[in-house]
């Protein structure tokens, strides 16, 4: 049986559907989202909440001529379905499939790549300015969630947009704030009617007449404007946006399609920047997601009937969970330890800490720059702040790490979760640059554990260290090894030798250490004897251990789940060069100079050649070429 959704291959097809049938289309899309995401995993709650909003935008605007910029982008599933990607939607976030985020290389309807938060208004304003410079007339719409509005860049963009007065529509998708029904209903009515073309033309005519009345006309006009502003401020929460120079419409019921269509059609005709404030419900239409939207923010495969995860068995505890438990253990012994996160208490494993130590836990919102400098302030006053943040998001606070932490040598701990490849979220979320961008900062100590037990000891080391220190660990389950109950400090800058051999030294860091050890066993079966070193520290390196291995073998393989440029392997090369050991052959294994796409972590590691099989094969091939002439300190990638 054909459905409304079956008739849509592009936004033009959507516009052929009668308005009174759009609510039925919304329900079909929700059913499709549940069916596919329950099998593939993905971001569910946020997408269920913006179905009507996405339909209304594509119904009232003309993509791709009109530009849509989706902040963060994980809520763009309906947008993708309506723009010709329904037949490939079952591949979203899968290896070789379509992205879970907007991607310009994927569709002309994806106007701007997103993945990190709070960028949409800045990008949209840039597009609006480009339109003005070209003499164009297309519309630009930035869709941003209330959570992303906690990011400073969003307000920086609002400030300039209000100053420039260019046509830009900002849709504030508010799924958290509670507005009482009466005020919300009346305000929706006022916003729809007072922004209609008839009212605005009438308003202009009245203003013109008042200005021409001798003596008192201008005074009456000023009084009328004050009255209008006071009324709107009383009726709506839009005073901030209006103070920044925006027209404000809302709040609007975000699941009422007739209302959304009317408002967006009115907004199209406004001159200057405008904010359309839309109230939505995360998880709309699926009770488990509405009840617990956080649990259905990012999900794996699940049973639609029960909402319970399927296809996975309980395994080893995650690195994230062990980090959170260990930090709480340390905090019981040291009242100076405080925890900071940027809107990710669940994702960084700090919910338990927050419950046990609510006065020592700080969720600063999506404000990574503030999180780092806030931590610096706490450290300056004698506390031991632990800033738990995804590796990819710390990039947003680089200047604060330099200026506010390292320059003052303050004891801030950076707990970098999701270090390395993260899997299905792809290039915007892989944490593969931290070893490079932190290593060269003076005073920074940088370490990565080989397993979850070493993570615990490294965290103990970090909170005891007098200076900035970063600890990076991967996404996912640990190795399932027993955990030491007594925590100990690891001497700064010390590695450990896990295996000894004279043919080659494999020096690995973090998640690549155990694969390196497994690779050594494979090589041993072929008569190749390898020394395996768990470096533990990227900065400072265990100089003597590495130099001794270089002297012993004359041949070094480095392994890391980080960009090769400026990473761990580069640090080893620099050490050898500084010591004049130009006869040592070096091959670096890691992430080449490209962005890594989405896919299961094991698949990505295999593709990059940093799993056990890849390390063994690269080592064997490198040794086979050992007799051939090679430049000193060969930087083979």
Swiss-Prot record:
It holds the Pfam family Transket_pyr. The keyword Nucleotide-binding does not apply. Mg(2+) binds at residues 146, 175. Thiamine diphosphate binds at residues 74, 115-117, 147-148, 175, 286, 368. Pathway: Metabolic intermediate biosynthesis; 1-deoxy-D-xylulose 5-phosphate biosynthesis; 1-deoxy-D-xylulose 5-phosphate from D-glyceraldehyde 3-phosphate and pyruvate: step 1/1. Binds 1 Mg(2+) ion per subunit. InterPro entries: Dxylulose-5-P_synthase (IPR005477), THDP-binding (IPR029061), Transketo_C/PFOR_II (IPR009014), Transketolase-like_Pyr-bd (IPR005475), Transketolase_BS (IPR020826), Transketolase_C (IPR033248), Transketolase_CS (IPR049557). It is an enzyme of class 2 (transferase). Gene3D superfamilies: 3.40.50.920, 3.40.50.970. SUPFAM superfamilies: Thiamin diphosphate-binding fold (THDP-binding), TK C-terminal domain-like. One of its GO terms (molecular function) is magnesium ion binding. Homodimer. NCBIfam families: dxs, PRK05444.2-2. Belongs to the transketolase family. DXPS subfamily. This is 1-deoxy-D-xylulose-5-phosphate synthase 1. The lineage of its organism: Bacteria, Pseudomonadati, Thermodesulfobacteriota, Desulfuromonadia, Geobacterales. The gene is dxs1.
């Amino acid at each position: 049986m054909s459905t409304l959704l079956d008739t849509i291959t592009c936004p033009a097809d959507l516009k052929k559907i009668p308005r009174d049938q759009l609510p039925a289309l919304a329900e079909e899309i929700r059913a499709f989202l549940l069916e596919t995401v329950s099998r593939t995993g993905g971001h569910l709650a946020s997408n269920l909440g913006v179905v009507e909003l996405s339909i209304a935008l594509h119904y009232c605007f003309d993509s791709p001529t009109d530009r849509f910029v989706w902040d963060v982008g994980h809520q763009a599933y309906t947008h993708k379905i309506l723009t010709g990607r329904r037949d490939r939607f079952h591949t979203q976030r899968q290896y070789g499939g379509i992205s879970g985020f907007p991607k310009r290389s994927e569709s002309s309807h994806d106007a701007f790549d997103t993945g990190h938060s709070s960028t949409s208004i800045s990008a949209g304003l840039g597009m609006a300015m480009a339109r003005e410079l070209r003499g164009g007339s297309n519309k630009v719409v930035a869709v941003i969630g209330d959570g992303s509005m906690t990011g400073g860049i969003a307000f920086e963009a609002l400030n300039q947009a209000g100053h420039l007065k260019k046509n830009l529509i900002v849709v504030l998708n508010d799924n958290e704030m509670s507005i009482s029904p009466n005020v919300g209903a009346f305000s929706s009515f006022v916003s729809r009617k007072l922004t209609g073309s008839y009212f605005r033309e009438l308003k202009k005519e009245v203003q013109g007449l008042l200005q021409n009345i001798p003596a008192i006309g201008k005074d009456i006009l000023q009084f009328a404007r004050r009255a209008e502003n006071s009324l709107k401020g009383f009726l709506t929460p839009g005073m901030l946006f209006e103070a920044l120079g925006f027209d404000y419409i809302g709040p609007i019921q975000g699941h009422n399609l007739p209302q959304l269509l009317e408002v967006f059609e009115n907004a199209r005709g406004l001159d200057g920047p405008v904010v359309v404030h839309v109230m939505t419900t995360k998880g709309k239409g699926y009770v488990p997601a509405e009840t617990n939207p956080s649990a259905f923010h990012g999900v794996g495969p699940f049973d639609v009937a029960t909402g319970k995860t399927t296809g996975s068995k309980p395994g080893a505890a995650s690195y994230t969970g062990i980090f959170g438990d260990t930090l709480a253990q340390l905090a019981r012994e040291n009242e100076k330890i405080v925890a900071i996160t940027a809107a990710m208490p669940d994702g960084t494993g700090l919910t338990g800490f927050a419950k046990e130590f609510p006065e020592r836990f700080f969720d600063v919102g999506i404000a990574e720059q503030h999180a780092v400098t806030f931590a610096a302030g706490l450290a300056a006053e004698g506390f031991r702040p632990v800033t738990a943040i995804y590796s990819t998001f710390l990039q947003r606070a680089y200047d604060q790490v330099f200026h506010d932490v390292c320059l003052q040598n303050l004891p801030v701990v950076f707990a970098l979760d999701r270090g390395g490849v993260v899997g299905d979220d792809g290039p915007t979320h892989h944490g593969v640059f931290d070893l490079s961008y932190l290593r060269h900062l003076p005073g920074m100590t940088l370490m990565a554990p080989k397993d979850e037990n070493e993570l615990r000891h490294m965290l103990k080391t970090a909170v005891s260290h007098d200076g900035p220190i970063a600890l990076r660990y991967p996404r996912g389950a640990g190795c399932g090894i027993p955990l030491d109950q007594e925590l100990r400090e690891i001497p700064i800058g010390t590695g450990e030798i896990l295996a000894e051999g004279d043919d080659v030294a494999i020096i690995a860091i973090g998640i690549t250490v155990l694969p390196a050890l497994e690779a050594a066993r494979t090589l041993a079966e072929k008569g190749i004897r390898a020394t395996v070193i768990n470096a533990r520290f990227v900065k400072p390196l265990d100089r003597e251990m590495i130099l001794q291995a270089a002297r012993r073998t004359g041949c070094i393989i480095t392994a890391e789940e980080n960009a090769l440029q400026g990473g761990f392997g580069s640090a080893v090369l620099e050490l050898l060069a500084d010591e004049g050991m130009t006869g040592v052959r070096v091959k670096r294994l890691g992430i080449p100079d490209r962005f890594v796409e989405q896919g299961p972590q094991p698949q990505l590691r295999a593709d990059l050649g940093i799993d056990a099989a890849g390390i063994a094969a690269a080592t064997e091939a490198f040794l086979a070429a050992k007799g051939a002439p090679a430049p000193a300190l060969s930087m083979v990638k």
